[in-house]
Design a protein with these regions (language model features):
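Conserved structural motif at the start of ABC-family nucleotide-binding domains
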Residues: 2, 17-19
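Helix-to-loop junction immediately C-terminal to a conserved catalytic motif
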Residues: 48
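Conserved ABC transporter NBD signature motif
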Residues: 56-66
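ABC ATPase NBD coupling module
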Residues: 65-79, 183
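Conserved ABC ATPase "signature" region
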Residues: 109-127
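Conserved ABC ATPase signature
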Residues: 132-136, 140
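Catalytic Walker B motif of ABC-type/P-loop ATPase nucleotide-binding domains
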Residues: 157-160
Length: 208
């Protein structure tokens, strides 16, 4: 699904990747690990079309990633769980989850029902959809971000330190959810230092 061939990436005089080649296949969970500053987040941002890269060295579904329009990629192909959650902090949970349902023709009742169901899936049934994001703990906000991606249901999910704000038990619950998505032929790539994710991933890739 994603083929990285001889990728080179530099920031000024600092080379992050030199001749990096990797293959990612749908229906699998990949864990990216390595020391801080090794390029995990940079690689995710490149795959998300946020960070530019040199040469035409990445293909997605057989097409050069650079040739895919960014708007289409963000709207239809990608779910990105940012390290800082990527949520609208001053908006309600419902407003944030609405972003995962863009493009779906749903009544207000259907939308609310789906959002309440996904909160149950991520262990947040006790929260109200009217609560503001800034009122939540870090772990709760992280799970709301995951709920938004689940609603969007994209073929590619990227996650940066997905479980950083979660305890080990909740980390396993979140991974169980991702493994369910994996069975639906989703490709999931997670940058993480968490051994819980290493254990459950199909492949662990260590960047130097």
């Amino acid at each position: 699904m994603i083929s990285v061939e001889h990728l080179t990436k530099s920031f000024g005089q600092r080379t992050v990747f030199q001749d990096l080649s990797l293959q990612f296949t749908e229906g699998k969970v990949y864990a990216l690990t390595g020391n801080s500053g090794c390029g995990k987040t940079t690689l995710l941002n490149i795959l998300a079309k946020i960070e530019p890269y040199e040469e035409e060295s990445i293909s997605y579904q057989g097409q050069e990633l650079k040739q895919i329009k960014q708007h289409h990629f963000f709207k239809h192909e990608l779910g990105y769980l940012f390290q800082n959650f990527g949520l609208l902090e001053n908006e309600t949970i419902a407003k944030n989850l609405d972003l995962g349902l863009i493009g779906q023709k749903l009544t207000k009742k259907e939308k609310k029902q789906q959002e309440e169901e996904v909160l149950k899936k991520v262990g947040l049934a006790y929260l109200s959809l009217d609560q503001k994001i800034y009122e939540l703990s870090g772990g709760e906000a992280q799970r709301v971000a995951l709920a938004k991606v689940i609603l969007k249901d994209p073929p590619l999910i990227l996650a940066d330190e997905l479980t950083a704000a979660l305890d080990p038990e909740t980390s396993r619950e979140v991974m169980d959810l991702l493994l369910t998505l994996k069975k639906q032929d989703r490709l999931i790539i997670i940058a993480t230092h968490n051994p819980v994710i290493w254990e459950q991933a199909d492949e662990v890739i260590r960047l130097n």
